[in-house]
Regions:
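RNase III-family endoribonuclease catalytic core
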Residues: 1-122
Length: 122
């Protein structure tokens, strides 16, 4: 647990945020393949909420930055910015992959699937 705490401290420094509840940060990085008991918590519920928050934040920014753009153009821009490809690229740029907690079988998955997992934690 000490090693995980040090790792999370490093992540907080990397992203420039400090979490009051480090358990939430740990949960946000825990893939369902990490089996820690029958009803082990993972990031899926947080991902659901995070996707909506990210979408809303990006939509609001696009709305302000492109005041004359029609809805269709805003939608295209939004979808590009919140896509799995974009989120995975951000995760890769930040090196978030090394912080994701997962079961060993994850290394056997196809690149497309691991890209989605990296995108999930953004």
């Amino acid at each position: 647990m000490v090693e995980l705490t040090k790792s999370l401290d490093g992540l907080e420094k990397l992203i420039g945020l400090s979490f009051k509840d480090s358990h939430r940060l740990e949960l946000a990085l825990t893939h369902s393949s990490l089996k820690q008991g029958r009803d082990a918590a993972n990031y899926e519920r947080m991902e659901f909420l995070g996707d909506r928050v990210l979408g809303l934040a990006i939509a609001e920014r696009l709305f302000v930055e492109f005041p004359t753009a029609p809805e269709g153009e805003l939608s295209v821009r939004l979808n590009l910015l919140v896509s799995a490809e974009t989120c995975a690229a951000i995760a890769d740029e930040l090196g978030l992959g090394r912080y994701i907690r997962h079961g060993g079988e994850l290394t056997k998955l196809a690149a497309q699937r691991t890209r989605n997992i990296r995108a999930d934690v953004v």
